[in-house]
């Protein structure tokens, strides 16, 4: 958790954190784009939930076995003793209800709502669908007006992304004509600068930022902007002719992208991020030069991503997918 302090350096740190929501937004948008015309399938929901359950409970069971022979790492010892152990068990075996993975939980709820959203969209005119997007846009920034009322949560976030993806799918031709790449890139830069400025003023504890309630909103920032940036990025990428991309590159991208759920489940596990970054900090030392710090941080992130991708691939192939197929074959014949 970042400590809120005044200054541009702190504002930049929070900007990096907020930019993580761009990837989340793109995932929700992709879901709406591809599922708007699809029929409801229980299998899709079960597969998502079961993968989350396998990673969450499997991590806990693995640590229990290791703990029988070796001492737990210092960073997770508090989670495995006393009253905290009960919460750890609940988080590991009931991840959906405990909120262990907010993104996956929101995604599952979005899938459950998808058939109703699709029916609603079909009954609405294009103007009404646009009005619905405007309504959700307002909900995302409502908290920034005096900081007292918010109707924005993980589910509304997921549904908003779904609605955007569905709107793009249904109006793809018109969007391609009206939304040019250069203005969208300029919009991304402009919104990024506004996010940075917001973080600076929100952390300054000025009378205006305090009166508007911004001092308590620096972590989430302007929630609408990462969604808008994610929308622009999705539209720009969708225009790329992937037939011209070398087969090796496209195959690698597809292979890595198939493990993104697993990477998230490993890293965001209550044990995962603690153990991972504890050992990364032990083996990696921060250089004195700022430039070298940035370069080394970049390579550390890439290496961690690739390592987690390989681990997730192994877990999925050896355990998750075979178990999922057997359960579905038995119960959903």
List where the protein language model places each region.
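Alpha-helical transmembrane segments of integral membrane proteins
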Residues: 43-51, 102, 129-132, 153, ...
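Interfacial loop-to-helix transition and helix-capping segments at the boundaries
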Residues: 11-24, 90-106, 144-161, 196-232, ...
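Hydrophobic membrane-embedded alpha-helices
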Residues: 51-82, 86-87, 91, 110, ...
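Alpha-helical transmembrane segments of multi-pass membrane proteins
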Residues: 1-4, 64-65, 199, 268-271
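Membrane-proximal cytoplasmic C-terminal regulatory module of class A 7TM GPCRs
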Residues: 276-286, 290, 315-333
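Alpha-helical transmembrane segments and terminal signal-anchor/GPI-anchor hydrophobic tails
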Residues: 175-262, 268-299
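Specific transmembrane alpha-helix
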Residues: 23-38, 103-118, 141-177, 221-244, ...
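Transmembrane alpha-helical segments and their boundary/interface "anchor" motifs
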Residues: 17-25, 31, 35-99, 110, ...
């Amino acid at each position: 958790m970042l400590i809120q302090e005044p200054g541009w350096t702190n504002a930049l740190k929070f900007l990096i954190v907020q930019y993580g929501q761009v990837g989340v937004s793109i995932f929700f948008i992709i879901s709406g784009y591809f599922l708007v015309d699809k029929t409801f399938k229980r299998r899709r929901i079960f597969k998502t939930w079961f993968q989350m359950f396998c990673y969450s409970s499997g991590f806990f069971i693995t640590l229990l076995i290791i703990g029988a022979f070796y001492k737990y790492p210092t960073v997770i010892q508090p989670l495995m003793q006393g009253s905290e152990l009960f919460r750890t068990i609940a988080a590991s075996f009931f991840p959906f209800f405990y909120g262990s993975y907010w993104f996956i939980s929101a995604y599952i709820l979005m899938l459950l709502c998808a058939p109703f959203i699709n029916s609603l969209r079909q009954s609405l005119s294009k103007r009404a669908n646009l009005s619905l997007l405007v309504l959700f846009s307002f909900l995302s920034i409502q908290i920034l007006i005096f900081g007292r009322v918010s109707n924005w949560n993980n589910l509304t976030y997921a549904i908003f992304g779904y609605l955007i993806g569905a709107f793009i799918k249904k109006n793809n031709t018109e969007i391609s004509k009206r939304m040019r790449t250069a203005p969208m890139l300029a919009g991304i830069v402009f919104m990024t600068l506004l996010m940075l400025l917001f973080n600076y003023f929100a952390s300054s504890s000025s009378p205006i930022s305090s009166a508007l309630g911004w001092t308590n909103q620096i972590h989430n920032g302007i929630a609408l902007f990462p969604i808008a940036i994610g929308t622009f990025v999705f539209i720009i990428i969708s225009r790329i002719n992937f037939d011209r991309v070398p087969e090796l590159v496209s195959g690698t991208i597809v292979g890595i992208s198939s493990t993104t759920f697993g990477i998230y489940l490993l890293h965001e596990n209550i044990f995962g991020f603690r153990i991972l970054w504890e050992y990364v900090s032990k083996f990696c030392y921060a250089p004195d030069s700022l430039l070298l710090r940035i370069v080394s941080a970049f390579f550390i992130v890439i290496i961690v991503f690739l390592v987690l991708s390989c681990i997730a691939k192994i877990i999925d192939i050896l355990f998750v997918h075979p178990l999922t197929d057997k359960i579905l074959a038995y119960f959903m014949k």
